[in-house]
Swiss-Prot record:
One of its GO terms (biological process) is methylglyoxal catabolic process to D-lactate via S-lactoyl-glutathione. One of its GO terms (molecular function) is glyoxalase III activity. This is Glutamine amidotransferase-like class 1 domain-containing protein 1. PANTHER family: GLUTAMINE AMIDOTRANSFERASE-LIKE CLASS 1 DOMAIN-CONTAINING PROTEIN 1, PROTEIN/NUCLEIC ACID DEGLYCASE DJ-1-RELATED. CDD domains: GATase1_Hsp31_like. It is found in: Secreted; Early endosome. Component of the FERRY complex (Five-subunit Endosomal Rab5 and RNA/ribosome intermediary). The FERRY complex directly interacts with mRNAs and RAB5A, and functions as a RAB5A effector involved in the localization and the distribution of specific mRNAs most likely by mediating their endosomal transport. The complex recruits mRNAs and ribosomes to early endosomes through direct mRNA-interaction. Belongs to the peptidase C56 family. The gene is gatd1. Homotetramer. Component of the FERRY complex. Glycans are attached at residues 154, 212. Residues 1-34 form the signal peptide. The keyword Secreted applies. SUPFAM superfamilies: Class I glutamine amidotransferase-like.
Length: 229
């Protein structure tokens, strides 16, 4: 049986004082942006006890690892906490914050995950901070109410713009266009120019448009959690 990762923490005292954050990634091939994950993980681990989780507890498969960052990922994958927990076994009530980095694979698995939907429903009901970036925002589409309405209707958010998506060779076969889904579901969607830093904060929900929006989005998550203490 695969050993699940333990939350990232420092010493015992530090672990008790830090809030816990669930970091969810896609489990599909080339499912997680290396740049967004690295920035999310390093920044968030300074403020939270992090627990990484994926569907089935499958290993993260990173896309776009640069030569500069390759050593960091080699070291990361040797750590026990690099082994994700099973998303199916996660109890959302144990976590203070939820972070979903830019995950191109989210279109395939997270956007249809009933387990993530339950976690998001809990976080929304309790107004706990949620931060999603790039295609990680698409993962939010899994969360619907009993009447099939979207949990995030009436929220303002951002995510990959059509102008960013159209550059992808698989654009014509994408199962979901976030901008269309959000607008059709009653949310307010905004986007800046392609690759620009653009972050939207609405109540307890923080969304970033793309990879480049990762750091300011996570910084807002930390500030939001600090303000709730």
């Amino acid at each position: 049986m695969k050993k699940q990762g333990a939350p990232v923490s420092g010493g015992g005292t530090e672990r008790l004082t830090k809030p816990s954050c669930l970091m969810v990634g896609s489990a599909v091939a080339e499912g997680v942006s290396a740049q967004s994950f690295l920035h999310s993980f390093t920044l968030a681990s300074s403020a939270f006890n992090l627990q990484v989780a994926t569907p089935g507890g499958k290993a993260l498969d990173f896309v776009g690892i640069s030569e500069t960052d390759s050593r960091w990922f080699q070291d990361f994958q040797l750590k026990p906490y690099s082994n994700p927990a099973r998303l199916e076994s996660i109890d959302g009530s144990r976590y203070h914050a939820l972070l979903i980095p830019h995950c191109p694979g989210a279109l395939t698995d997270l956007a249809n995950s009933g387990y993530l939907a339950r976690i998001l429903q809990h976080f929304t009901a309790e107004k706990k901070p949620i931060c999603a970036i790039g295609h990680g925002v698409t993962a939010l589409c899994c969360a619907t109410n009993q009447d099939k309405s979207w949990v995030f209707q009436n929220y303002s958010l951002t995510g990959p713009s059509v102008y960013e998506l159209v550059r992808r060779p698989e654009y014509a076969s994408l199962p979901l266009i976030l901008e269309d889904y959000a607008k059709d579901s009653g949310a307010t969607f905004s986007a800046s120019e392609p690759d620009a830093i653009h972050v939207v904060l609405d109540r307890h929900l923080i969304t970033g448009q793309n990879d480049n929006s990762t750091m300011p989005a996570v910084q807002n998550l930390i500030l939001l959690c600090n303000g709730r203490k």
